Amino acid sequence: CLLNINIEKEWFDTYECEGETISFMSAIMVKILHLYAINTKMTFEMDNEKLKISFLYEDKREKIFELPLIDIDKDILDSQPIEGSVEFQISTKSLDKYISEMLLFGDSMEFICYKDNLFMKSSGDEGNYTLKIPYEVLDELIMEEDLQLKTRVSLKYLYYLTKSHNVFKHLQLKIEADVPFHVVIEEEHFKLQYYIAPKISDDEDNDESFQDFDEDHYENYENQVV
């Protein structure tokens, strides 16, 4: 997967930079950010080839961290815009619920567009779970006419992102066959783009069949999503 975050200078209370590029271990940064509390003032600054991070809490406690900078020899991948055959916006909390349910049955998910309907499906040794997504839970939807699309993606990478539902209320998915899932979270002065490579299925016949998603398959019951 590829994560690209663009933060404009207006997003910060104060911002001074001379165009530097720095690299550090993201795993260490995640551990530090777990110590953040609401209304804490955070400061990032360069100090003698180290990234210095300070937290000033409401009770006047102060924590200071220093991260060593590293050199990255690998080429930095640049994100590319993707125009999906289907694009929709959904509540991050709702998608988190669906992804958590899918993980009960497998570690990957099929996303299917068929006859103007959207489906999510997870399969495993203990059975299958198919969810028909009602349009009512979508804030926006753009779909090509007569689209038939089926693609598979790892659930864990989506799960990492949807756990941010307390911070980001909505996200947008742009989906096209045989290209990475493109997830976008965009707010004022802030844009996050997340690319997840599709998984290749070993069952070619299953990939080509849409019969399980015909309306007749659902005529005996209603699939309701809260």
Descriptions of predicted regions:
Residues 1-104, 110-226:
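DNA polymerase sliding clamps and clamp-related checkpoint/processivity subunits
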